[in-house]
Regions:
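Short beta-strand segments and strand-loop junctions that repeat across beta-rich extracellular domains
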Residues: 170-177
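Short histidine-centered catalytic/ligand-binding loop motif
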Residues: 97-103
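Basic, often amphipathic N-terminal segments
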Residues: 1-83, 104-168, 180-205
Length: 205
């Protein structure tokens, strides 16, 4: 994402990505799938990025960071750890191949929890937060037509299974407008399944 015009000169803009991160064994298993796809179809995006489920992607001024983290902490405090099941492959024609998440509802419910404060994630009218309502693990994106067609012909028949317990989400950050810059972990937000009254007491007590 690149910030469009209408940003305040002199103020730093960052790109943020909120994700669910699987355990190391599953991460390595997905990395192997991505590497195999790259070796056969020469798709550079298959090697980019760590395996995760993206929840929301947005641009915002660095000075807003603390307020955003506080709101995300509130969401995480009230949310419960849940099981994420992966099975086989899916695609977004005609550019992306991914690993299916079959337990979509808890992920969608989590994304829904963040919509009420989307104004905090809105840089300006041209840069609004992008909520990901179709949870998945990307194998490769931005594919050329031949890569997609041949790749999907193969991967639509392939099998994959995996599962993990999502007990937290990670807020990642990188400076906006710098291509191919890797994200850094900014904050881990643990799901605590606390009642609302406890949350408010802890935040404002």
């Amino acid at each position: 994402m690149k910030p469009s015009a209408l940003t305040l000169p002199g103020y730093k803009v960052n790109e943020y990505l909120l994700v669910l991160n699987p355990h190391e064994e599953l991460r390595n298993k997905i990395k192997e799938v991505k590497k195999e796809f790259h070796d056969v179809y020469k798709a550079p995006t298959a090697l980019h990025g760590k395996p995760h489920i993206a929840l929301v992607n947005f641009l915002q001024y660095a000075m807003m960071e603390e307020r955003i983290i506080n709101r995300l902490k509130t969401v995480a405090m009230g949310f419960y750890p849940f099981k994420v099941e992966l099975k086989d492959f899916g695609s977004f024609p005609s550019h992306t191949i991914f690993i299916n998440v079959t337990t979509k509802e808890p992920v969608r419910n989590l994304v829904k929890e963040m919509r009420p404060f989307q104004q905090l994630m809105k840089l300006n009218n041209d840069n609004k937060p992008h909520f990901i309502d179709e949870p998945h693990f990307t194998v490769a994106r931005k594919l050329l037509p031949w890569q997609y067609e041949k790749g999907w012909l193969e991967y639509s028949q392939k099998h994959f299974t995996g599962r993990f317990i999502a007990d937290s989400m990670l807020l990642l950050r990188r400076q906006a407008g710098i291509p191919d810059q890797p994200y850094q972990i900014l904050q881990r937000l643990e799901f605590m399944n606390l009642p609302v009254t406890t949350k408010q007491g802890e935040l404002f007590g």
